[in-house]
C-alpha cells in the first residue's frame, strides 16, 4: 500500500470509503518518541489492518496560550518516525478542520467521577478537550481498534468510558508505560527539562517504582514517607494519591490492585507518573455447567496469558476415582476422613504441553474422564467435608495468584475476589454435541445423543441444587453463551475482557 499523508477531513472521509480494510488508529499530538513508536509497531504487529497515525496538537488540552505555544512541533520528524515504524497513512488536520467555525461540533464533557480526581483537580476542562477531539477523530476515521498508552492512565479510563457511553464499536488496545534510561516515563514534554530538573523527575519516578517493590513484600504503602522524601529534594508535588485504579476513589484495604499516582512540577514543566500495586498476581475464575467448553477455553487462556491452569473439576474427579478404586463408602464420614487425610493430587505438565493429573503418584488423566466418574462426581463434590478440603487446597494454590481456574464455584466460593469472573454456558443441544465428540470421553461417544442430553440435564440439576457451593453465576461474573462461537472466538473475548480489567504494566515481575 502506498504511504499517504492526509490533511483535510474531506480527504479522510473519501479515503475511508476507498479502502477495503479495517483501521488501527493511533492518535498523537506530535513530537513522537519511543512510546509512540511502541504504539505504532504494536498496531502493525497485531493484525493486517491499515495503520493510521494522527498528528494534531489539540488546543483544548492546554492550560494556557503560552503552554500551547511552547509545545514542541516536529512534524517532519514525526512523519518519518510514523512511516518508518508501520504507519500506512498519517492524518495531519488543521484546527479549522477539526473545529470548523460554522459547524456544530459536539463539545463533550468528561464524566465527573473520573475527571475530578488527579489531573482534573487543577486542569479544569482538560479532559473535556480530550473527549471532544478524540470523539471527533473517531467519528471521522471509524477505526476498528484504538491504540493508547497507559502512561496517561486517567485519560485512558476516560476514553474507555467515552467509547462505552457513545456505544462505539471500537476496541481499545493499551500498552504499558514506556520509560527512558533513567526511569522517567517517555513524554513529549521531556525536551523542556534541564539536567537538574531531569534528575529530580528521575528521583520521583524511582521513588514510585521503589514503593511498588516494597508493596509486593509488605502489602502496604506509606504516602507520608514518600512525600517527605520528595519534599527533602525540593520537588514541587501537585498531588500524590493511592487510589482504586478504575474508580479513582481512595484505595481500600481489601483491594488487590491499586494505583499510586503523582504529578510534580519542575520549572515550567509538569509531569505525571504512576505505578500499579498488587498484593498478588491476577486470578481469572471461569465457571459453568458440563460441556460448556470450560476446560478447552481455560487451557488456551492459561497458555496465551502465561498463567497457571487450575482444573478444579479434575481434583473432584481425582478424588472420586480414588474412592471407586479403594471401594470406599463415601457416605461414612470416618472412611472419607481417612482418604482425605492421605490423598495427594498433583498437576504436572507433560511433553505435549498439556497437564496430567496424578493421584498418589499415579497418572489418572484419562481415567477420571470416564462416564463412571461422571456419574458419581457430583454426589461426592456435594459432601461438605470434600468441598471444604478441596477448596482449601485450591486456595493454597492460588495464594500468590497468577492463575486461571475453572469449575462450578470458582467465582462464588473458591476465589470470590478474582479480578475477572466468567460464567461460560451453552444450550443443552450444543453441550451434548461437544461431550459426544470429546475424544477424552471415549465412553460418551457410544451413548445415544438423547440419552446424553438427559445425563447433562441430570448433572445440571445436581450441581445447581446441591446445598453446598451450588452451580450459580456470581453477581459480578460476565456470562458468555458460546453457541455458534468457535473456541478461539471465546478465548479472544475473555482475553479482551482480561486486558480491560488488568493494566498491562501491573504484572508483578
UniProtKB/Swiss-Prot annotation:
What is the predominant subcellular site recorded for this chain?
cytoplasm
Question: Where does this protein hold ATP?
Answer: 29-36, 149-152, 186-189
Locate the residues binding (R)-pantoate.
61, 155
Family affiliation: In the N-terminal section; belongs to the pantothenate synthetase family. In the C-terminal section; belongs to the cytidylate kinase family. Type 1 subfamily.
Q: What is the lineage of its organism?
A: Bacteria, Bacillati, Cyanobacteriota, Cyanophyceae, Synechococcales
Q: Which InterPro entries match?
A: Cytidylate_kin, Cytidylate_kinase_dom, P-loop_NTPase, Pantoate_ligase, Pantoate_ligase/cytidylate_kin, Pantoate_ligase_C, Rossmann-like_a/b/a_fold
Q: Which domain of life is it from?
A: Bacteria
Q: Which GO terms describe its cellular component?
A: cytosol
Please identify the protein, giving its name as recorded. Bifunctional pantoate ligase/cytidylate kinase
Q: Which Pfam families match?
A: Cytidylate_kin (PF02224), Pantoate_ligase (PF02569)
Q: Which organism does this record belong to?
A: Prochlorococcus marinus (strain AS9601)
Amino acid at each position: 500500500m502506498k504511504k499517504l499523508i492526509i490533511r483535510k477531513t474531506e480527504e479522510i472521509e473519501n479515503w475511508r470509503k476507498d479502502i477495503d480494510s479495517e483501521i488501527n488508529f493511533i492518535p498523537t499530538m506530535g513530537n513522537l518518541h519511543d512510546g509512540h513508536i511502541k504504539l505504532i509497531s504494536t498496531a502493525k504487529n497485531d493484525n493486517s489492518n491499515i495503520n493510521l497515525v494522527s498528528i494534531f496538537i489539540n488546543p483544548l488540552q492546554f492550560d494556557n496560550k503560552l503552554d500551547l505555544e511552547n509545545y514542541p512541533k516536529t512534524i517532519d520528524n514525526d512523519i518519518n518516525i510514523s512511516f518508518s515504524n508501520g504507519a500506512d497513512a498519517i492524518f495531519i488536520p488543521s484546527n479549522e478542520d477539526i473545529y470548523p467555525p460554522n459547524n456544530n461540533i459536539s463539545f463533550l464533557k468528561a464524566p465527573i467521577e473520573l475527571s475530578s480526581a488527579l489531573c482534573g483537580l487543577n486542569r479544569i476542562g482538560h479532559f473535556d478537550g480530550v473527549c471532544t477531539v478524540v470523539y471527533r477523530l473517531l467519528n471521522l476515521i471509524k477505526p476498528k481498534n484504538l491504540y493508547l498508552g497507559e502512561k496517561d492512565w486517567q485519560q485512558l479510563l476516560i476514553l474507555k468510558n467515552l467509547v462505552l457511553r457513545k456505544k462505539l464499536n471500537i476496541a481499545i488496545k493499551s500498552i504499558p508505560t514506556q520509560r527512558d534510561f533513567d526511569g522517567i516515563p517517555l513524554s513529549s514534554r521531556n525536551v523542556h527539562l534541564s539536567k537538574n530538573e531531569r534528575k529530580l523527575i528521575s528521583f520521583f519516578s524511582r521513588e514510585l517504582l521503589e514503593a511498588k517493590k516494597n508493596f509486593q513484600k509488605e502489602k502496604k504503602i506509606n504516602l507520608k514517607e514518600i512525600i517527605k522524601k520528595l519534599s527533602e529534594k525540593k520537588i514541587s508535588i501537585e498531588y500524590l494519591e493511592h487510589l482504586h485504579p478504575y474508580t479513582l476513589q481512595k484505595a481500600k484495604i481489601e483491594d488487590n490492585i491499586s494505583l499510586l499516582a503523582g504529578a510534580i512540577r519542575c520549572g515550567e514543566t509538569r509531569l505525571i507518573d504512576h505505578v500499579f500495586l498488587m498484593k498478588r498476581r491476577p486470578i481469572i475464575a471461569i465457571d459453568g455447567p458440563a460441556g460448556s467448553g470450560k476446560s478447552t477455553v481455560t487451557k488456551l487462556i492459561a497458555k496465551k496469558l502465561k498463567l497457571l491452569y487450575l482444573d478444579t473439576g479434575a481434583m473432584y474427579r481425582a478424588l472420586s476415582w480414588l474412592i471407586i478404586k479403594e471401594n470406599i463408602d463415601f457416605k461414612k464420614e470416618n472412611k472419607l476422613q481417612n482418604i482425605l487425610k492421605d490423598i495427594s493430587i498433583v498437576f504436572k505438565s507433560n511433553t505435549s504441553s498439556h497437564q496430567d493429573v496424578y493421584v498418589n503418584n499415579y497418572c489418572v488423566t484419562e481415567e477420571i474422564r470416564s462416564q463412571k466418574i461422571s456419574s458419581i462426581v457430583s454426589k461426592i463434590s456435594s459432601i461438605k467435608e470434600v468441598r471444604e478440603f478441596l477448596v482449601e487446597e485450591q486456595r493454597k494454590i492460588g495464594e500468590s495468584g497468577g492463575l486461571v481456574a475453572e469449575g462450578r464455584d470458582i467465582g462464588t466460593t473458591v476465589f470470590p475476589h478474582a479480578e475477572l469472573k466468567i460464567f461460560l454456558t451453552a444450550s443443552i443441544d450444543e453441550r451434548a454435541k461437544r461431550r459426544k465428540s470429546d475424544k477424552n470421553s471415549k465412553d460418551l461417544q457410544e451413548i445415544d445423543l438423547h440419552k446424553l442430553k438427559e445425563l447433562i440435564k441430570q448433572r445440571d440439576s445436581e450441581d445447581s441444587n446441591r446445598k453446598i457451593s451450588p452451580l450459580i453465576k456470581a453477581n459480578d461474573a460476565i456470562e458468555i453463551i458460546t453457541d455458534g462461537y468457535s473456541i478461539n472466538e471465546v478465548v479472544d473475548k475473555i482475553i479482551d475482557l482480561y486486558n480491560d480489567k488488568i493494566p498491562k504494566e501491573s504484572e508483578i515481575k
